[in-house]
Amino acid sequence: MSITAKSVYRDTGNFFRNQLVTILLIALLCAFISMMLGHAFTPNADQLAILSEGDAMTNSASLFELVQNMTPEQQQVLLKASAASTFSGMFGNTLLVGGVLVLIQAVSAGQNVSALRAIGASAPLLPRLFILIFLTTFLVQMGILLVVVPGVILAIVLSLAPVMMAQDKAGIFRAMRNSMRLAWRNMRLVAPAVLLWLLARAALLLFAPAFAALTPQIGAVVAGTLSNLLTALLLIYLFRLYMLIRE
C-alpha cells in the first residue's frame, strides 16, 4: 500500500481534533509540572545575582570563555540552574510523550481515557522513556552544537524511537537502532514533519519574551503548553505513520 504524507496529515488532524480536550489537559499538566520542578530546583534570586558579578559576561566571546572566566561559585550556580532547567524539561517531556502515546493506543483500541489516567497508565514506560529522551536529546544537541545539520538528521532518524518503545515494548537501544533504519528508509515521510516541528518550536522561542511578560510562572506554563501541543501533534503523526508502515 502506498503511503502519502497528505493522508497521514489528515488522519493526524482528525485525531487531534477529536481528542483536543484530553491532549490539551495532558499538555497543560506536563507544562505545569515542569514549571513547578524548575521553580523548586532553580537557585533563588540572590544566588542567580552572583552570575552578573565581575567581568565574565563582558569579557567573554563564547560560552566556553564565559564559563572559564567565572569564579567557582558562579560556575556552581550556573551548573545548578542548568541542571534544574534540563531535568524539569526532560521530566515534563517524558510525562507528555508517555501520556500521549498511551492515549493514542487507548483510543485506537476503542477505549475512552482521561488525561490523568493516560499519564498514570504510562508509568511502567516512563523510566525507559526518560533514559531514551535523555540520550536522544544529548545526541541531537551535540550534533546541532557541532555543525547543526548532523543534529537535525539525528532528530529525524531517532524520532520513531519513542513510538517503537511504547508500541513494540522495545528496549532503549533497540528502539533507537530500529528507528534509525526505518526513518532513513522513509525519510520523505518522516523528515518534513520533524522539520516543521523544529521550525515551529524555534518560532515559539521568538515569542518567549511576550509570554514572560504575563509573569514568569504563567508565561512558562503557557509557552510549555504550546510547545507540548506541537510535540503531541508530531507524536500522533509518527504513531499513525509507523502503524501504516508496519502494515
From Swiss-Prot:
A GO term from the CC aspect: plasma membrane
Cell membrane among keywords: yes
Listed transmembrane segments: 21-41, 87-107, 115-135, 138-158, 194-214, 218-238
Primary residence: membrane
Subcellular location: Cell inner membrane
Membrane topology: Multi-pass membrane protein
Coiled coil stretches, renumbered: none
Keyword tags: Cell inner membrane, Cell membrane, Membrane, Transmembrane, Transmembrane helix
Domain of life: Bacteria
Pfam families, sorted: UPF0259
InterPro entries, alphabetized: UPF0259
HAMAP family recorded: UPF0259
UniProt similarity note: Belongs to the UPF0259 family.
Name this protein carries in UniProt: UPF0259 membrane protein ESA_01554
Originating species: Cronobacter sakazakii (strain ATCC BAA-894)
